[in-house]
Amino acid sequence: MANRIKKGDQVVINTGKDKGKQGEVVRVDGDRVIVSNANVIKRHTKPNPQAGVAGGVVEREASIHISNVNIVNPATGKGERVGFKVLEDGRKLRVFRSSGEALDA
């Protein structure tokens, strides 16, 4: 099944500590997404001189389940659900469920 959320989409987070934050999807891994500047965690890394890693506390974005984000509708500025519409030539098109407006051309 095709994913409703793709890399580069503007999304809003529905639940969790970052509820309400908006950001761009950096990566999609199956049913999880990584959103820029959201769900930031701290990782303690050991120094590795061979790889040029200094070590210490590193902050990075952790993944969020795809069901906890909605795509932002540019017309309304709100997060909305997305569905699919099959065109006559057989292509699938992502559309907003509220308005039926096409997401990608």
Curated annotation (Swiss-Prot):
Which Gene3D superfamilies is this protein grouped with? 2.30.30.30
Q: Give the protein's function.
A: One of two assembly initiator proteins, it binds directly to the 5'-end of the 23S rRNA, where it nucleates assembly of the 50S subunit. One of the proteins that surrounds the polypeptide exit tunnel on the outside of the subunit.
Q: Which GO terms describe its molecular function?
A: rRNA binding; structural constituent of ribosome
Highest taxon of source? Bacteria
Q: Does the keyword Thylakoid apply?
A: no
A single GO BP term for this record reads: translation
Arranged from A to Z, the UniProt key words for this protein are: Ribonucleoprotein, Ribosomal protein, RNA-binding, rRNA-binding
Q: How is this protein annotated for GO cellular component?
A: ribonucleoprotein complex; ribosome
Oligomeric state and partners? Answer: Part of the 50S ribosomal subunit.
Q: Which family does it belong to?
A: Belongs to the universal ribosomal protein uL24 family.
Query: PANTHER family under this entry?
Result: MITOCHONDRIAL RIBOSOMAL PROTEIN L24
The molecule here is called Large ribosomal subunit protein uL24
